[in-house]
Amino acid sequence: MSIDRKKVEEHIRGLLVAIGENPDREGLKETPSRVAQMYQEVFEGISYTNDEIAEMFNKTFEEDLVIPKDNKEIVLVKDIDIFSYCEHHMALMYNMKVAVAYIPNDKILGLSKIARIADMVGKRLQLQERIGSDIAEIMQKITDSEDVAVIVEGQHACMTTRGIKNTGSRTTTTTLRGAFKTDTNLTNRLMMLYK
């Protein structure tokens, strides 16, 4: 599903009128078009399913890779910067850092692809918890590894700029799959690497 820029422009113009603004004044004349263009970029991930994202970034390396059957070595990419928008208020989720870990099975994924997956998943109306589970699902599909962990930290404008207005709060969510969920020693190793 692609974004209907024309409809977005019409609705943004209507929203400006509804909040008491004049959409024809100098500073707002191009706002509906600018917002539509911005939404096309920041909500790009809405256009793709998790399967399509997995296919898009499925660049694995298998040649010259010798992985023992009992492998418990962790690949961790952390401090991946993303942003998203809360699906409840359409408010920005910002200062987000994502960490993605997996235990290679028969494939390793190009590291930049992990960051691209996190970025694309964030470009949807989201819940922070779902960002983690979507990334984990995509990683499992690409790597054929059940052992995936995702940690997401971020701030939510729906908490910092409205309601309670708690500007210092950060939310951390974890998604643990496979051995990361069942093996306490492995989970502890992950958390030590994550710090």
Curated annotation (Swiss-Prot):
Q: In which pathway does it act?
A: Cofactor biosynthesis; 7,8-dihydroneopterin triphosphate biosynthesis; 7,8-dihydroneopterin triphosphate from GTP: step 1/1
Q: Name one GO molecular function term.
A: GTP cyclohydrolase I activity
For biological process, the GO terms are: one-carbon metabolic process; tetrahydrobiopterin biosynthetic process; tetrahydrofolate biosynthetic process
Q: Which PROSITE patterns match?
A: GTP_CYCLOHYDROL_1_1
Q: Which InterPro entries match?
A: GTP-CH-I_C/QueF, GTP-CH-I_N, GTP_CycHdrlase_I, GTP_CycHdrlase_I_CS, GTP_CycHdrlase_I_dom
Q: Which GO terms describe its cellular component?
A: cytoplasm
Q: Which family does it belong to?
A: Belongs to the GTP cyclohydrolase I family.
Q: Which NCBIfam families match?
A: folE, PRK09347.1-2, PRK09347.1-3
Subunit? Homomer.
Q: What is this protein called?
A: GTP cyclohydrolase 1
